[in-house]
Design a protein with these regions (language model features):
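Cleavable N-terminal export/targeting peptides
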Residues: 1-38
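Outer-membrane beta-barrel channels and translocator barrels
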Residues: 38, 78-82, 120-126, 173-176, ...
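Membrane-embedded beta-strand positions of outer-membrane beta-barrel proteins
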Residues: 45-47, 88, 131-133, 166, ...
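Transmembrane beta-strands of outer-membrane beta-barrel pores
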Residues: 49-55, 81-83, 92-98, 135-141, ...
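Extracellular loop and loop/strand-boundary signature of outer-membrane beta-barrel proteins
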Residues: 57-63, 98-105, 149-155, 241-249, ...
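Residue-level signature of outer-membrane beta-barrel architecture
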Residues: 75-81, 117, 121, 133, ...
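Outer-membrane beta-barrel transmembrane domain signature
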Residues: 184, 188-313, 317-319
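Outer-membrane beta-barrel "beta-signal"
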Residues: 351-365
Length: 365
């Protein structure tokens, strides 16, 4: 019996020692994580300036001296702790081109603002109940540069797109790549084409002065020109009250279905990111316009369920020599109901595409 009690006491002592050792090991691991800087917040991104210049002297093939510069930033902020994930992305760029000519020497070449944030609660591994909000617009006036008068085709808040939605987000990391797929059946979208009275009056006068100076072809002159109406017509912020009457508004509000997919991959000094965003409104085609609109058959102007707004962005960057960077950025857009004028002056719904390849000073972190 004495031997049994002695053995039992030894087992108890062994268990206590083992438990203390495990506790010490876990505490050491936690301390090591803390010392290694495993934090809830993570901030990374890419900023830079691309530039190019062309100089010509007695160049038989023709051309003009020009300088082009684009400043850009892609910033990403992530908070992830326990079951909470909060992610914010800010993408922006602005570019100007100087051309050696008397008229319109400075022309805007790029202009973009995109801010998106989403807050999620992880209810199952890699699955999040998420609230998402985003905004996109531009900084400065956009003009259609051509001979004579250059009409205004866009500005700050004309257009702008604001999205708010609630949905499910699947997030996964694998081999250096972060994947996200978000689907929301409860999504709101507000599209604006806003211009204040003072700015509207100013640019209406500019149009009339350009006509008086002979800069506008008389066959294309509109005596009732109004910039606000032009922009609201282009971006579809109006509503038909009957087959021939439009009620113009500063904004269009829609409720619908949205999808967003994203991939971000980093390998040493190489970075790739791409996002695809889709939205379709919960509404029908509307009533027949009986041919009163040359572009659309029905009153909802092709903005009905099954017709998707498309935004697809791709960004590639490679950093070398610590401060030099090669970048390629593309953006493809398609918005049903948005009319775009081509070189011949014809209006139609069109796929929009922008590609920028540059080399310049940049920094990734």
């Amino acid at each position: 019996m004495f031997a049994a009690l002695t053995l039992s006491a030894q087992e108890v002592d062994k268990a206590v020692v083992t438990g203390n050792a495990d506790a010490a090991k876990n505490a050491g691991a936690d301390l090591q994580k803390l010392e290694q800087g495993e934090k809830a917040w993570k901030f990374d991104g890419t900023i830079g300036l691309n530039a190019a210049a062309t100089g010509l002297i007695n160049w038989a093939a023709g051309g003009k001296n020009n300088v082009n510069g684009i400043a850009y930033a892609k910033l990403h902020l992530l908070y992830h702790k326990n079951a909470i994930a909060w992610e914010t992305n800010f993408d922006t760029d602005f570019g100007l081109t100087w051309i050696d000519q008397k008229e319109d020497a400075f022309q805007k070449s790029s202009d973009n603002i995109k801010l998106a944030t989403k807050f999620g609660w992880e209810f199952h591994p890699t699955w999040y109940l998420t609230v998402l909000g985003s905004f996109q617009s531009q900084y400065a006036l956009g003009r259609n540069y051509q001979d004579g008068y250059n009409p205004i085709i866009s500005k700050w808040l004309a257009p702008s797109i604001t999205d708010v939605s609630v949905g499910i987000d699947w997030k996964k990391s694998y081999n250096g790549a972060d994947f996200s797929i978000y689907l929301s059946p409860i999504a709101g979208r507000i599209t604006t084409a806003y211009i204040g009275d003072a700015w509207n009056n100013r640019y209406n006068k500019e149009y009339q002065d350009a006509y008086a100076a002979g800069l506008i072809d008389p066959s294309k002159y509109d005596p009732n020109y109004d910039l606000r109406t032009e922009l609201q017509e282009s971006y579809g912020t109006y509503k038909y009250t009957d087959a021939t009457t439009k009620e113009y508004r500063n904004f269009r509000a829609e409720f619908g279905l949205s999808f967003k997919g994203a991939i971000a991959y980093t390998y040493q000094d190489f970075k790739l990111s791409t996002t695809l965003a889709l939205f379709t409104p919960y509404q029908g085609k509307g009533f027949d316009l009986n041919g009163s609109n040359p572009y659309f058959k029905y009153s909802n102007c092709n903005r009905y369920f099954g017709m998707f707004d498309v935004d697809w962005d791709v960004a590639l960057s490679y950093q070398f020599l610590k401060c030099l960077q090669v970048t390629l950025q593309t953006s493809l857009k398609y918005y049903p109901g948005t009319l775009i004028e081509n070189a011949n002056g014809d209006l139609a719904e069109r796929v929009q595409f922008k590609g920028v390849l540059g080399i310049g000073v940049g920094y990734s972190f």
